[in-house]
Regions:
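Hydrophobic transmembrane alpha-helices that form the core helical bundles
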Residues: 34, 38, 102-123, 150-167, ...
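Residue-level detector of conserved catalytic or cofactor/ligand-binding positions
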Residues: 383-391
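Membrane-water interface regions at transmembrane-helix termini and the short interhelical loops
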Residues: 4-11, 39-51, 71-89, 138-144, ...
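N-terminal alpha-helical transmembrane segments of multi-pass membrane transport
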Residues: 1-133, 273
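Transmembrane alpha-helical segments of multi-pass small-molecule transport proteins
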Residues: 21-35, 60-68, 225-251, 270, ...
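Transmembrane-helix boundary/entry motifs in multi-pass membrane transporters
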Residues: 8-18, 52-56, 86-104, 136-148, ...
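Hydrophobic alpha-helical segments and their helix-loop junctions in multi-pass secondary transporters
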Residues: 28-40, 63-80, 207-224, 236, ...
């Protein structure tokens, strides 16, 4: 009997090794975390300390290097390369593309950290070394969420877009992107190892984002509806909502994703406009935002290369290096999506568009929400921070 037509295409076959090995390890880890929470937390803390204290400089070098590489690619002849055929036209309108670009890097944690990240720095000795909370507490949030993080995404997005739309590779795997370097070894152990590491990185990023989203939503529900909701119940609710959104996106493809992205943009910027116009801190938000942005640009290279070699505060190890590692983890997923939706656009448009939509929207979010809460704290209108703030 001829079974030729029953065989699945190569890119649609299930890779059981990549599926079962991470699943097994995750189940084992979950059991260990549940049975030995204190010991597990101690081990994870030691691993994080080792990576930040011993290998932290490499994260900083890679972060700055990738950002500079993105600028070079966008301004060089390689920026003219079209991600697609010679006469390929963009698949999505400029607004739809930009909305999906921004929401590719948007999660619940941006709402949490836009509003409150300055609180985490307020009592840090490093801020006192630099100057005052007023001057520096709102600078680092912008730095940690803007140019270098999106540089990680956009360099890889250009590479993946070239792989998908120019080389016409259908397997959206990290190993496939490494085929020019690995050659025949892509389909062997080396390629499998790369894909396994990518899966573990994606799981780690998802877990981190999920751990931030759950308490944020619990607090919001408690404040809005005065209902104390158990974290386990909230987790189930989030999973159900996630399944609904995923199913909608699956049934409607990128058209559905585009619709959800635009709806998210309208809601998000509607919130920002409401806070700016009716929050009572418009003047403070604008003036402090301009000052913070200018200070970040003026001191960009110093912020990007500060290592605290004597460990007087360990600020870069605790924060900057942690963030760079966090963004690197999400490079497993976001660049593939950005590269996919950028079909028909040039490499230059992809990179600069990412900085315009992604970085621009992120900075606006941190300026409005962060300076709103900081202004309320400094004026005494609200006790948001864990410690009193001084000018």
């Amino acid at each position: 009997m001829n079974t030729q037509h029953t065989n699945l295409p190569e890119h649609k076959k299930v890779d059981w090794m990549i599926t079962l090995v991470p699943l097994t390890i995750i189940i084992v880890l979950c059991i260990l975390f549940f049975c030995m929470p204190d010991q597990s937390n101690a081990v994870i803390s030691q691993i994080r300390f080792f990576l930040g204290d011993t290998l932290g400089s490499y994260y900083l070098i890679i972060g700055l290097g990738v950002f500079l590489l993105s600028i070079f690619i966008a301004s060089s002849k390689y920026g003219n390369i079209v991600l697609g055929g010679k006469n390929e036209k963009p698949k999505y309108s400029f607004f739809s593309w930009g909305a999906m670009m921004f929401t590719a890097g948007l999660a619940a944690d941006i709402l949490f950290y836009s509003f409150s990240e300055w609180i985490l720095y307020a009592t840090d000795p490093h801020i006192a070394e630099l100057g005052s909370i007023q001057d520096w507490a709102s600078v680092y949030p912008i730095f940690h969420w803007s140019l270098i993080p999106w540089g990680f995404y956009l360099v890889l997005a250009a590479a993946f877009g070239f792989m998908l739309h120019v080389r016409k590779r259908e397997r959206q795997k990290y190993s496939e992107a490494c085929r020019p370097l690995l050659g025949k070894y892509t389909d062997g152990f080396a390629g499998r190892l790369i894909d396994l590491l990518a899966v573990f990185a994606l799981l780690a990023g998802t877990a981190t984002t999920f751990s931030l989203a759950t308490p944020l939503m619990a607090s919001a529900i408690n404040e809005l509806f005065h209902v104390n909701i158990d974290s386990s119940i909230l987790t189930i609710i989030i999973l159900i909502i996630t399944c609904i959104v995923y199913t909608y996106s699956l049934l409607h493809g990128f058209k559905g994703i585009s619709f959800l992205a635009k709806a998210c943009i309208y809601l998000f910027f509607g919130l920002l406009a409401f806070v700016l116009l009716f929050g009572g801190e418009a003047k403070y938000i604008i003036e402090t935002g301009i000052s913070s942005l200018g200070r970040m640009v003026q001191n960009f290279f110093e912020l990007a290369t500060f290592t605290d070699p004597q460990r007087t505060t360990s600020f870069p190890q605790n924060w900057t290096i942690f963030y760079w590692a966090y963004w690197m983890v999400w490079c497993v997923a976001a660049p593939f999506f950005i590269g996919n939706i950028s079909k028909g656009r040039t490499v230059r448009q992809t990179i600069l568009g990412g900085y315009a939509f992604g970085v621009g929207s992120t900075i606006v979010s941190f300026i409005i929400l962060g300076n709103y809460s900081l202004g309320k704290q400094i004026s005494g209108a609200a006790e948001i921070g864990r410690a009193s703030c001084r000018e």
